[in-house]
């Protein structure tokens, strides 16, 4: 249930859609399985496999985007097209020209696509209409952009802004390391990366290793800045903050994993319980993280 990698955005206006209106918007761009004539297709699927495209609970909305990609190697298309071209050459007495070869490859692609294997990738989206967050569970910017691209088509207009803070994460993390002091309610963990800003981009990394403060200060004095820092919030959630304000490797600690009601809950109740826990904890984490970076910057 817990999102692992957070791409964070702001809702710039109050959420205006009710449940039925949101379902109607999502249905227009629902994933259509079995479309055999496209290399890639995108669409919304049910987060709970219950038919509803949005799972809504106490102002928290969960969506899932499915991306299907056909596996059709260019070498396979070229091999079949080459064989077809030889047949045509025998029939017409001369080799197909460039335009004709292009048409042959297009026909071959159309013939092979229905037989090609597909790979599927699901990306989850959390919309917090209470605290005005929109969070995508994606490690790569390209995947987040894919989601945003379909979201703006699905919900028009979509009240969405990038998140900006007063102090850059790199400057803040560098300051915390130099002072050997984390902001209130946070602690610094054992993974970090410091990187030079010049052409060399030389980097030093601590991986599951206690940070030597004097060593880190020497690197900072030589011009390096912190670009990744492992932290824990409130002894409840661990994560890695990056220079681009991404929050990666999010993990609830043991205190949050203990659910005394789990044994008596059915699947739906457990899902809702996990969703309530995650959205509540991460919303508070994000608010305090933004505060530790000087607050939100209005642009």
From Swiss-Prot:
Keyword annotations from UniProtKB, A to Z: Cytoplasm, DNA recombination
GO cellular component, one term: cytoplasm
Protein's job: May be involved in recombination.
Name this polypeptide is given: Recombination-associated protein RdgC
Major location category of this protein: cytoplasm
Gene: rdgC
Keyword match Cytoplasm: yes
Superkingdom: Bacteria
GO biological process: DNA recombination; regulation of DNA recombination
NCBIfam families: PRK00321.1-4, PRK00321.1-5
Organism: Bordetella pertussis (strain Tohama I / ATCC BAA-589 / NCTC 13251)
InterPro entries recorded: RdgC (IPR007476)
Homology family: Belongs to the RdgC family.
Keyword Oxidoreductase (UniProt): no
Pfam families associated with the record: RdgC (PF04381)
Alphabetized GO MF terms: double-stranded DNA binding
Subcellular location: Cytoplasm, Nucleoid
């Amino acid at each position: 249930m817990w999102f692992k990698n957070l791409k964070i955005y702001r809702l710039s206006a109050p959420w205006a859609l009710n449940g039925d209106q949101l379902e109607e918007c999502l249905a227009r761009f629902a994933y259509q399985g079995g479309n055999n004539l496209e290399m890639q297709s995108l669409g919304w699927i049910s987060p709970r496999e219950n038919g509803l495209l949005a799972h809504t609970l106490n102002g928290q909305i969960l969506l899932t985007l499915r991306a299907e990609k056909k596996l059709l190697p260019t070498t396979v298309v070229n091999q079949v097209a080459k064989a077809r071209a030889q047949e045509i050459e025998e029939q017409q007495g001369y080799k197909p020209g460039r335009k004709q070869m292009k048409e042959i490859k297009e026909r071959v692609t159309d013939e092979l696509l229905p037989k090609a294997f597909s790979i599927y990738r699901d990306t989850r989206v959390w919309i917090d209409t209470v605290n005005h967050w929109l969070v995508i569970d994606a490690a790569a910017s390209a995947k987040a952009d894919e989601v945003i691209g379909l979201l703006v088509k699905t919900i028009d207009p979509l009240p969405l802004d990038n998140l900006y803070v007063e102090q850059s994460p790199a400057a803040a993390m560098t300051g915390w390391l130099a002072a050997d002091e984390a902001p209130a309610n946070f602690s610094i963990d054992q993974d970090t990366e410091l990187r030079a800003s010049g052409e060399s981009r030389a980097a030093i990394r601590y991986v599951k290793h206690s940070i030597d403060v004097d060593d880190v200060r020497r690197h900072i004095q030589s011009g390096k800045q912190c670009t990744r820092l492992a932290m824990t919030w409130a002894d409840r959630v661990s994560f890695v903050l990056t220079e681009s304000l991404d929050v990666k490797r999010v993990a609830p600690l043991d205190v949050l994993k203990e659910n005394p009601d789990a044994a008596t809950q059915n699947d739906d109740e457990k899902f809702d319980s996990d969703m309530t826990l995650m959205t509540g904890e991460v919303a508070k984490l994000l608010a305090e993280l933004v505060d530790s970076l000087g607050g939100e910057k209005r642009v």
